[in-house]
Amino acid sequence: MTVRKWLTVAAVAAGLGLGTALPAPAADTKGQFTFGSLRTLSPDAGKAKAEAWLKKAGKFDQAAFDKVWAQDEVSVLDRTLATFELGSAEAKKVLAAGTNSAVEAPKEVPEVLKDAKQDSYFRANLALGFARGLTNGRVYEESLATLQGVKAEDTVDPAAYFFHRAVAEHALIKRDDAVRSIVRLIDDVADAPDRYTMLGRIIFEDMANWKKDEKDLSNIRRLMDNSERRLAQARGGKTTQDIQKKIVFRLDELIKELEQQAKGGA
């Protein structure tokens, strides 16, 4: 049994309401892969693609490039991002914003990452680097929006793509979407690191314990966590206000339900 089937059966047993299949969201209908079709780009292939991009950008510096790719202990993704920084001041700015997101949370996806005219290799991997920084900084909304705008198969590290997407979806209480991302991480990426698959399973098991009732206190607590997180990031705008309205509404409904139960038992 593939992990896809196992998680589907487990999801149904846990009452996640995913049915007998896990179709991808409409935005991901193109370029779908199945069981083990995706892999991290090898260092040699990653270096070749990065070199071609840097030369096309007209910023190729052999010594600087070789220094980046001589670091065998550094991931292909990180060496790719370092190459982007050599060839694009805009990429350097975007990555710095992602790294600094815990201090100053970005409030929108950078324009370069939304520009479909950009080279797909450059845009997808820069988006992944930016989103990874945002996930680490707990800026989940923009992290998810960034990843939704690109395809995993255009990245040099599809496992990182699905992992950080699942983390953001889990944090934003998008249970079905998070399950789909975990399925693709474990089932579709042949060389997904153990740390990603292990954490993916932990996330899945956590969601299996979520209650269906929106008025359940644990579900309300998750909304409160998101509200508190956004306020701590100085993001008290409409999205935060909408979350707070949901909290008040669900607490009010819970109180009414408890009052009705008390009357019925009187």
Sequence positions of predicted segments:
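Sec/Tat signal peptide C-region and signal peptidase I cleavage site
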Residues: 18-27
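N-terminal secretory signal peptides that target proteins for export/translocation
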Residues: 1-5
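Bacterial N-terminal signal peptides
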Residues: 9-19
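Mature extracytoplasmic or organellar-lumen-exposed domains after removal of signal/transit peptides
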Residues: 26-160, 164-266
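General helical structural elements
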Residues: 8-9, 169
